[in-house]
């Protein structure tokens, strides 16, 4: 039996002992947050956030901004994360908001911090278990680009106190543009089966669940970038006939050659196979309530999976003047000179990890008088063997909107500035962002919460979490004889030899840390409708095992995240208003920048620069829900925030002696808007027919670390019509981006070293970056039987 498996079963035994010692307790219970409820500040879920309306994805939950850079979207099912780490096993590859779920909501930041040790909102979902009789739900969704999505759940009883539930999810999504390498940009299938036994006259409920997923999220790399002309005033215009969002920027060829990080062997694969994710999960859940109201819930899940993330990251986009003898394969198979104006270099990243994880959570809770207390325990074990192989290649940048082609260096055998292997297409294997780690991470935590109505006017909610984190394994952060990190070089792998004679071998790592989280919230009613509210959450963390993937060790100091909010609320029969001031900061963020510099020879050199930095954000949020007349609902959310970098400094020396330096301390954090507005009106035309819209405004965002480039504010818009035909059938039509906005968002590839004073000279230049999801019409139907 593998060592990793032995570790998992040992952890399972420890978890069982801990369960017996602590008597367990209740998973975060589903509570629908009502903005009209005075106690909503202390419910575990947020309301009015439309978490599944996502302008970046057709089938995944959106990220809710909290003033910090993008991080993992936390998604829970039955109270535990659906995946321990989203690289390499992404949420969308094994979880969808489909017919297999009985509930999808959004946990508050404080609840997420106490129960998981993470910061941010979390999607909160529960599996649809068997009910009496025979029940079924069939959901169907399509769009005008040809997406076909099916979701089916069947459940019922098979004998006294025995219940079943089975679900199937199938997604065939070609995306918003055709690519030559595969007919689908998302091909995902998910199967679930649950068997439930109720016992002791219904007081207890024991459930076993099997979950299988197989997913090819091609969109991960297919929609990663596109070329555009940066005008210089925050706007962009289309490059030639390349339509953003509806034209493919991927080369026609699906092949990828790489050097295996573990063995050094040069291998060939195709991108569709490289991005495959598959997993098998086994879950046991128990829920028991004693006659005195004491409730015990426990869940344990074993996950055996292969996770994969593939990126085709745009690096430099330069004019075709570097003196390279580029050829391309024409339609007839002949090699012809490339005479296009531009050349796009890309870095292919093939990330794959083999995962065994065990998660155990148990909670004990009871409502006693005017308070509810909860005691919980997490035992989470994560074992992974992970590597990321990188390959550089060049492609054409066609102005006519045709498919790009890979470019071949006819002089590759004698070309001095790059290291080719076998042919003139692929070069500099594993030189830039290649990664490796193998080991396990274990977290065991004890937490409690207390929700207490002290008086009719005062409610207090507080909790704490104490977590022990252990990390063991190997990575490839190798030092030479002088004690300096070797870094990555061309043809890097475990067993290679660096230029200074250093042998590349796995480096052991072993860490033990204590983390904790504290939260407190208070609501005081000055009148029956008006009151004061405030909350504070403080969480400490340490690096996770994936932070040890690069060529240097991360900063292992404590990461601290304090979040405080205070304000007022007002409720009456037709209006609910909350207005809060907030502060959030985060210390010791670990990151690695791939800095680019054009040498005197005209070649673009890429160097990795690790750094550690802090962030702080001041903000003000006002949330309004109103019902001015029958059938009409209106939600308005306004947020102003000012996220800034603290201690953001790094530098790297390129081969020609040029020192690339970044000092972004005091700058606005890249890609985060300072103003966010959400407007959500809806109207019931009849009791069965609803029309609705959702507008989201994001103000100007900076597109590089130095705040030199920026994109103007943009609207994300949704609208739809929902018709409840009868108690069995519901139909819907949704329009995404009905204002038909086009343009860029996010960051600009290769722009990290550009300073503000130099940005003007790049006006009118062709660049590459991410873009807004195009106009899309979606159709849906839901049949219950």
Regions from the PLM with identified roles:
Residues 66, 262-311, 343-388, 427-461, ...:
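Outer-membrane beta-barrel transmembrane strands
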Residues 29-133:
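Acidic, small-polar-rich N-terminal luminal/periplasmic segments of exported/outer-membrane proteins
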Residues 456-457, 574-576, 580-587, 595-597, ...:
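Gram-negative outer-membrane beta-barrel transporters
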Residues 86, 99-105, 112-193, 199-206, ...:
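Outer-membrane beta-barrel translocator/receptor signature
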Residues 135, 161-164, 201-206, 293-296, ...:
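Repeated loop/turn-to-beta-strand initiation elements of outer-membrane beta-barrel proteins
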Residues 355, 372-382, 387-391, 395-418, ...:
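Structural signature of Gram-negative outer-membrane beta-barrels, strongest in the C-terminal barrel
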Residues 183, 196, 205-283, 308-350, ...:
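Acidic/polar loop-and-plug regions of large Gram-negative outer-membrane beta-barrel proteins
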Residues 29-31, 697-702, 723-785:
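C-terminal beta-signal and adjacent terminal beta-strands/loops
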